[in-house]
Amino acid sequence: MAASTSTRFLVLLKDFSAFRKISWTCAATNFHRQSRFLCHVAKEDGSLTLASLDLGNKPRKFGKGKAMKLEGSFVTEMGQGKVRAVKNDKMKVVKEKKPAEIVSPLFSAKSFEELGLPDSLLDSLEREGFSVPTDVQSAAVPAIIKGHDAVIQSYTGSGKTLAYLLPILSEIGPLAEKSRSSHSENDKRTEIQAMIVAPSRELGMQIVREVEKLLGPVHRRMVQQLVGGANRMRQEEALKKNKPAIVVGTPGRIAEISKGGKLHTHGCRFLVLDEVDELLSFNFREDIHRILEHVGKRSGAGPKGEVDERANRQTILVSATVPFSVIRAAKSWSHEPVLVQANKVTPLDTVQPSAPVMSLTPTTSEADGQIQTTIQSLPPALKHYYCISKHQHKVDTLRRCVHALDAQSVIAFMNHSRQLKDVVYKLEARGMNSAEMHGDLGKLGRSTVLKKFKNGEIKVLVTNELSARGLDVAECDLVVNLELPTDAVHYAHRAGRTGRLGRKGTVVTVCEESQVFIVKKMEKQLGLPFLYCEFVDGELVVTEEDKAIIR
């Protein structure tokens, strides 16, 4: 029985060997046929290369068991002495991307007439006392009117708000030039045409006031503010009754009303994110994503479904500093955006990021790039001082500083809201009109404080950085840091509250002796001289060594 089994096994093995021999013979025959074909091609066309076979591109290997594909428009199959060209249906055709047409900015514009604005808008500017555009306005207005998505970067107080409001008002609303608008009057009244998002209530209210000034008392209802701290029901009723063309608000309140179905923004043509570097923080992320999904659609983006009734929106990002996070957001949310600065307009694709996207820890180049943009955000006509004081004497130092510089409008910064009331109480006890502003104040209280501060009824406004972000008080001539900012970027945001629109401004940092090294570190990072000063006999006195630096 064992012998019979062995015999059968040998017979099967012999048959299998014969089968393998036949397979190898067929493969060899096929190989020699192809070799003869290649030799024939070589004799007729010279040397045998990939180019001679119309395969000029390099081969690319795929996974095991898959045929080798060539990165070209056609794949050549050889066999049976014939050549057949087969088109690769899965091959993607990459179109050459045309560079965005950049409008030459009018840096030498001496009047708003040169920017091509409607006559009605020019009359409003003249009525409000605006005669000469700033550098950033001369650069931004033509670019936005041309239809470019834009990132506007300029130092604090350079007129960035008007830089985007003017082109928007020239396209929509009662001041728009009729020949530019492609929408009927009924569409304008039923759909929101522009949305402006700000990180704080103060900045949102400030933008609304600027729009109302330009629109005038007759058309002021064409803009509606949607900010937190106010009655939501009244805001929804105002939306339904007034049918505004422009909405200005904070991310949370806008997203809240949008979820309730009371905010119709599919026909929105303009989306502005002011102080976008702050809006990119984690606590705004969910609301910002909802706004981006419901406010029009990105220009150049295809429809998500079979029918997409959303209008193409023009996206404008605004900030005094443009770190890599802003550049990344602009490329994701916009279509071929341009970077608008006070002296140039360039495609954002040409701006080199300072660090890779996935960098979890800031590198030296990333930190240097952020510091560089911070320096650019500072108003040019600022003087920076620091003085040493014990913690319990800081309020007296603040009072002596105000008297020595004869300051009329002062903003004093602290890091925590709970300490503001104590500082205000001590200043009031010493006969200096002051008030506090923080997040716990309601909308009415904050509006009242800001109005009194701008009118001069309040000399010192004590606040924290978040509440004062975007605060625009052109008359502010002194900023005092009663507590040190966390870094150079926060210092720049505080310092930007003074020296606005080319005015002179002073920044004084009050620190303890153990904190001087922090001031020196910020001085080195910003590349600006921080002069040590003292207040003697009602005057600000600078040491002889620092006087040499001034000269």
Curated annotation (Swiss-Prot):
Comment field on protein domains: The Q motif is unique to and characteristic of the DEAD box family of RNA helicases and controls ATP binding and hydrolysis.
Top enzyme class: hydrolase
Name of the protein this chain belongs to: DEAD-box ATP-dependent RNA helicase 47, mitochondrial
Superkingdom assignment: Eukaryota
GO molecular function, one term: ATP hydrolysis activity
Pfam hit, one: Helicase_C
Binding site for ATP: S154, Y155, T156, G157, S158, G159, K160, T161
Major localization class: mitochondrion
SMART domains, sorted: DEXDc, HELICc
Name of the gene: RH47
UniProt function note: Essential protein required during embryogenesis. Required for mitochondrial metabolism. Necessary for normal plasmodesmata (PD) development and aperture regulation.
Keywords, sorted A to Z: ATP-binding, Helicase, Hydrolase, Mitochondrion, Nucleotide-binding, RNA-binding, Transit peptide
CDD domains from the UniProt entry: DEADc, SF2_C_DEAD
Location within or outside the cell: Mitochondrion
Helicase ATP-binding domain segment(s): 141-340
Domain called Helicase C-terminal: residue spans: 397-548
